[in-house]
A protein has these predicted regions:
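Eukaryotic phosphotyrosine signaling hubs
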Residues: 5-7, 67-72
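Core segments of cupin and vicinal oxygen chelate
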Residues: 2, 10-51, 180
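Short, flexible loop/turn elements at secondary-structure junctions
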Residues: 9, 32, 48, 60, ...
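A short alpha-helix capping/helix-coil boundary motif
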Residues: 22, 63-66, 86
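Residue-level detector of functional hotspots within protein domains
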Residues: 1, 12-14, 40-42, 58-62, ...
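Vicinal oxygen chelate
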Residues: 3, 13-16, 72-118, 123-130, ...
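Conserved short beta-strand elements that form part of the metal-binding/catalytic scaffold
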Residues: 29-67, 112, 118-126
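Intrinsically disordered, low-complexity regions
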Residues: 35, 56, 135-136, 162
């Protein structure tokens, strides 16, 4: 199974300054933003059709050990690959904090590597859903049952729709943006 780099979630202290820097200096666009549990999240991308290459969470502590990167994410081809990885991880005693989470637009397994670095293995669902949001899912369920349960859990959520429609909208938006540059 091939792992493809996807995104990083970074803990920040000055959200507005970080967003301004990454949008104005590095050319990212904000694709979503919102609060979960009183913590602000902002998602940014400059690559079609990715929802985000970077995520910022306003949760960085002022002192202590390095604490700015929440996790590194790797995309796999499909839900069965995520389920297989979950099975492998649960059998490895070096791996801790295994958490299967679906965000409606992805099935993810989060975990800590042997040095407690956060890792995410995920694949896209067939849907786009406004972010941030999420809930647990059971990788031991049959694949069709997981798909049905996920659709049921998120079909009433904001911006719920086919992922390919979202990809087309992102692609069109970025093409228009690039066409307007001199």
């Amino acid at each position: 199974m091939q792992l493809r780099w996807s995104h990083a979630l970074v803990h920040v202290t000055a959200m507005d300054a970080m967003v301004v820097f990454y949008t104005n200096v590095l050319g990212f666009e904000v694709t979503d933003r919102g609060d979960v549990g009183g913590n602000e999240f902002v998602f940014l991308s400059q690559v079609e059709p990715d929802h985000h290459q970077l995520g910022f969470s306003a949760t960085r502590e002022q002192r202590g050990r390095s604490n700015n990167v929440a996790h590194f994410a790797f995309r796999v081809d499909d839900l069965d690959a995520v389920k297989t990885m979950h099975e492998v991880l649960t059998q490895d005693e070096r791996v801790t904090n295994i958490m299967p989470i679906t965000h409606g637009n992805a099935w993810s397994v989060y975990f800590n590597d042997p040095e407690s670095n956060g890792i995410e293995i995920f694949c896209d669902t067939p849907w786009h859903v406004a972010q941030p949001q999420g809930g647990p899912w059971d990788p031991t369920m049959a694949t069709d049952d997981i798909i049905t349960a996920t659709r049921s859990a998120f079909e009433g959520a904001s911006e719920f729709g086919p992922i390919n429609d979202y990809y087309d909208e992102r692609t069109s938006h970025l093409e228009q943006r690039e066409g307007g540059q001199t």
